[in-house]
């Protein structure tokens, strides 16, 4: 075990030589909010596409009411990790559209950075990369994350093999080829200039279930996550799942209302919150409002 721990520490240093802050630093920097006992902290976290689905609007309306009925906070966070979908002026559009419906934010994107209420920022994910890296480094140190060098072609080959065998597709168990690479092998490949993503070393089991209480639907049972999901892409930018878990935690979000399409992500989020040592916010999933909203119905 000692040797593993040493390897993990070395690996963390190899992957994140410039990360000098720890999760503890951020936990202190963003303490729990001093709010009345029943107050809820909610958020709207759209991608900056400049287009608001009805589903987003519906969730925002619910979130704003929940936050403001007991002296809570409703903030705007921008999920801009996907550069391809970014549209100039999108943030202003979002704020103006919501203002048209009398939905006002208390803090977040759209307020000046030095505004006193913006103590939990930055509120754009691209400006928070060093925070995600601190948590990623900590997961590597604890043996809960690892670099994966598999190419798109290799992943595609595995997927076809899984489909032929009629098993669940994805990167898990015996199909997770990079899961058990030695430190020396990893170092050799990085030195050779190979690029990699960072994956979660999932602790989930295919025959176990999680039980969680949905604020809207009540108790729900779902299979545990078993996938070694990607946490950081090749360019070091986090995936939506990883970023939002850290953001919801550090911004001290208590309640998330989102479209029913996100229900399938709960096992992933459940495991992420667990390995990161975070308390999960209360999730409420709404039924689909409209067919065309299914894809992105308000995250």
Where are the model-predicted features located?
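Active-site cores that bind ATP or allylic diphosphates and position pyrophosphate for catalysis
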Residues: 138, 142, 146-299
